[in-house]
Regions:
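C-terminal intrinsically disordered extensions
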Residues: 4, 75-79, 151-152, 156
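Solvent-exposed loop/turn segments connecting transmembrane beta-strands
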Residues: 32-45, 85-87, 115-125, 150-159
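Cleavable N-terminal export/targeting peptides
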Residues: 1-27, 170-173
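Gram-negative outer-membrane beta-barrel domains
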Residues: 119-121, 127-173
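Gram-negative (and chloroplast) outer-membrane scaffold detector with strong preference
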Residues: 49-142
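Short glycine/serine/threonine-biased micro-segments
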Residues: 31-33, 110, 127, 163
C-alpha cells in the first residue's frame, strides 16, 4: 500500500512539472515595437506572434518606416522634412528560433522577409536580427530587438538599428 501511494505522489509531481514547463508554449501575443535605425530613420511594428515548442515562434507583422533629413531651405529638421522625406510600409513573416533561455527571459534569432512599398514603387526586404524577451506577470513580455533589413528595390540598401516594445497575450491561458 505504501509503494502505491509513493507511485501516485510521484506521478502527480511529474504531471504538475510538465504542466508548469509548458505554461507559455503554443500561446499567441500581439506586440508593438518602436525603434531607431541607421541612418536617420525610425520604425514602428505591429505584430502577431505564435509561439511553438521550446520558445520558438512565428511572427506576422506590419511595419512602417520614416527616414528624415534636414530641410535644405531652413537648415534644420521640419515637419515636412521628417514626415515626407522617405517612407515605407511592409507586411511580412519571421521565424524566431530560440537560442538562449534563462529565468524569465530568452533570446531568439529573427529571420524573415517582408514586402511593401515606398510612396512610389514595390519594395522587398530580407529581415535578420536578434530579439531578447523579458517575461513579466500574466504573460506580458518586454523585448529588445537588434535588427537589420536588406532592401530589394528600396532607397536604403541596409537598415540596421534597435527596437524596443511590449507583447500582450491573447486568448486563453
Amino acid at each position: 500500500m505504501n509503494a502505491i501511494i509513493k507511485r501516485m505522489m510521484l506521478a502527480i509531481c511529474l504531471a504538475s512539472m510538465t504542466a508548469v514547463a509548458s505554461a507559455q508554449t503554443y500561446s499567441n501575443r500581439i506586440g508593438l515595437g518602436v525603434g531607431a535605425l541607421y541612418e536617420r530613420g525610425f520604425d514602428a511594428t505591429l505584430s502577431v506572434e505564435h509561439e511553438t515548442k521550446n520558445h520558438n515562434a512565428w511572427e506576422y507583422f506590419i511595419n512602417g518606416y520614416v527616414k528624415y533629413d534636414k530641410d535644405e531651405n531652413v537648415g534644420h529638421i521640419t515637419n515636412d522634412s521628417f514626415w515626407k522625406n522617405y517612407r515605407t510600409w511592409g507586411v511580412g513573416v519571421a521565424y524566431k528560433p530560440c537560442v538562449f533561455r534563462g529565468k524569465n527571459n530568452y533570446g531568439a534569432l529573427r529571420l524573415g522577409g517582408s514586402i511593401g512599398s515606398d510612396t512610389h514603387e514595390f519594395v522587398g526586404w530580407v529581415n535578420a536580427g536578434y530579439e531578447h524577451n523579458f517575461v513579466l506577470h500574466h504573460g506580458i513580455k518586454l523585448f529588445v530587438q537588434a535588427k537589420t533589413d536588406l532592401a530589394i528595390n528600396g532607397l536604403d540598401l541596409f537598415r540596421t538599428g534597435v527596437s524596443i516594445g511590449v507583447k500582450f497575450p491573447v486568448g486563453k491561458r
